[in-house]
């Protein structure tokens, strides 16, 4: 449910774009993301760092889009965010020797170090490619095509890659699940 909730601002952006224009849609995106963050803080008493960073990028690039009445800024936001994600994954692996993917998922999944590294690199590569593809779509094709790509294309690619990542680590999951089950067993049983 939480993952669906995070897509609400994107859905609002799409619907408002289809019924008005990119500038009003950008304003709706800023407001809906701000409300989502406020709701998360109210509900959980905290907000995830990635949500704050993404909102900050939307706020900066979205405000520039609206104030300067130039959609180039909101289009660049996608590229910059994906490039930063890619860079963060690479830096975490090569400079800190602690892949972000592992830091995010190690409480849920136990994988060998080389698998964490491969997964981290795969996601870094995906984000780098998506960053580059966004530049092409945003600046070579129509605004409507870019919005459709941003909302549906990037989402579909990310979901497909998540599925592929799951298939890649699948053979390691039974051992992890077994350990979790035995760790959670009630000693009185």
From Swiss-Prot:
Keywords: Cell inner membrane, Cell membrane, Membrane, Transmembrane, Transmembrane helix. It is a multi-pass membrane protein. Its main location: membrane. It holds the Pfam family IspA. It is found in: Cell inner membrane. One of its GO terms (cellular component) is plasma membrane. InterPro entries: YciB. The keyword Transmembrane applies. The chain crosses the membrane at residues 4-24, 53-73, 76-96, 121-141, 149-169. The keyword NAD does not apply. It comes from the Bacteria. PANTHER family: INNER MEMBRANE-SPANNING PROTEIN YCIB (PTHR36917:SF1), INTRACELLULAR SEPTATION PROTEIN A-RELATED (PTHR36917). Plays a role in cell envelope biogenesis, maintenance of cell envelope integrity and membrane homeostasis. Belongs to the YciB family. This is Inner membrane-spanning protein YciB. It comes from Psychromonas ingrahamii (strain DSM 17664 / CCUG 51855 / 37). The gene is yciB.
